[in-house]
Structure formats: C-alpha cells, structure tokens
Amino acid sequence: MKLAMAQMSMSGSMDENLKKSLAFCDAAAGSDLLFFPEVQLTPFFPQYAGRNVDAYAVPAGSPTVQAFADKAKECGLYLSPNMYLEQEGKRYDASLWLTPEGVCAGVAKMVHIMQAAQFYERDYYTPSEDGFLVFDAPWGCVGIVICFDRHLPESIRTCALKGADLVIIPTANTKAEPMELFEWEIRVQAMQNQIFVAMCNRVGREDGMDFAGESLIVHPSGDVIYKADDREQLIVQELDLAEARLWREHKRPYLKQRRPECYL
C-alpha cells in the first residue's frame, strides 16, 4: 500500500487550514491512505490554559467533516484528518476514518489526556470512551493512536493485539522536546509489537512552541524507513503490510509468548 502523511504548518485561520489540508489530499491522490498532524485545522490552542476555544470546535456532521469525506471520495483514498471534534455535547481530540466511498466509518479519540505546562489538554478534551480502535482496509488493518497516547505502551500493544498491521500517530511534537528519544520510543514499540508505525507531526512556530516535524515511518523490525526534516511537505511511502504479519508470526513472534495472567 502507499501511505501519505501531510507534515504541515497551521495558521490562525480554520478556513486556510482546511484549504491547505484539502490541497494535500489532491497532492496525495494515488495513495491509499493519507493522514495529518494533531488538530490540523487550528493553532495548537492547548499550549494555553483555560481559554475559550468554542470557535475551534468542529461539530460531527458539519460542512468541514463533509468536505473531508467528499475529498476522500474524489481522490479515491482512505483519509484520517485529526481535529477538535464536538460530538453529542462533548469535545475530543479525534481522528476520523473516512473511506474512498466518502463514508465516515469511525472516529478514534485520544484516550489519555495530558496536563502539563504548554499542554493544558484536560482544559479542552474529553477522554475517549471507546479505547483504541483499528480499521480494516483491503490492504491491511490500521490502528490510530493520538499523540500523547503513544507514551503509554498499552496503546500500540492494544492495536497490535487487535490485528493492526500499521499504527498511525497524529502528533504535535516541539523542538524543545526530546525528539531523538521520541524516535527510539517509536522504533522500540514497532519492534516489540512487530508492526509498522507512522507518526505525522506539525511544523512551524506558534507563539511559544516551535514544532519539530521529523515525521517518521518505522518498519516492524524497528528500522527507520523514512524520517523527515522540519519543513512542510507531503511524505509518500510504499509499504508492504504483509511484512508485519510475517514478522509477528515467524521472524519475531513475541506476542505469542505473552502471559497476560502474570501482568497487572
């Protein structure tokens, strides 16, 4: 399959960010799956505590969501935009799963909500009630793990146990964070779970945050397939997701050795 990631910067205008996102979809036509960084339609507002961000909430079923669904159908690809989604009176850090038929087949929501300096996410996000979700496609099974959730190893492990061949991670990592350590974190989890992992980051400076880019694709062996720099770009990479199953079943069958009865 052909995976595409839109490593992009965001302005203060949701309309501009939507137009840019849809332009990335056009550029990715011919790919099988395109996904984006965390909260791609807005500035990274969680860097501020307790602000009124009503204007940034995207209602489920809104024209914005429909625009992405229509574009998925037009381009004939699976599409996973991440946004500040409002659904049934609650707001989430959420990634949609849109099919090439233009149907929203599911919504993955952040499970663990961080609260720390410049990441005041509990001020804005409701934790997922659904846990970690995986989605089937003709070329494989995809799990979605949103940003901070990847720091809890149960996230990618759960996706692997549910049969995912690939985990995609929309994120917002800054240059002030330990990016080299974050790379190794992804590599180790890919190796431990015999799974492809792709992480798509923001770029650009937004007030006190300088987003690092360095989007990453890692093989089930733990080897880096692709690593970006800090510039805005569309990343397209061919992946054979059958390799995840080969590694999990034969080359490194770690998951078969698990003894859950011994774990807390």
List the predicted regions and their residue ranges.
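CN hydrolase (nitrilase-like) catalytic-core segments centered on the catalytic cysteine
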Residues: A57-Y78, H151-L234
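Residue-level recognition of beta-strand->loop/alpha-helix junctions
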Residues: Q7-S9, P37, K109, N201
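Short, acidic/polar
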Residues: E16-C25, L152-R157
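Active-site-proximal beta-strand elements of phosphoester/diester hydrolases
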Residues: M1-G12, A94, G140-D149, I168
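A conserved C-terminal secondary-structure "cap"
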Residues: A244-L264
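Active-site catalytic loop in hydrolytic enzyme cores
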Residues: E86-K162, K175-W184, E249-P253
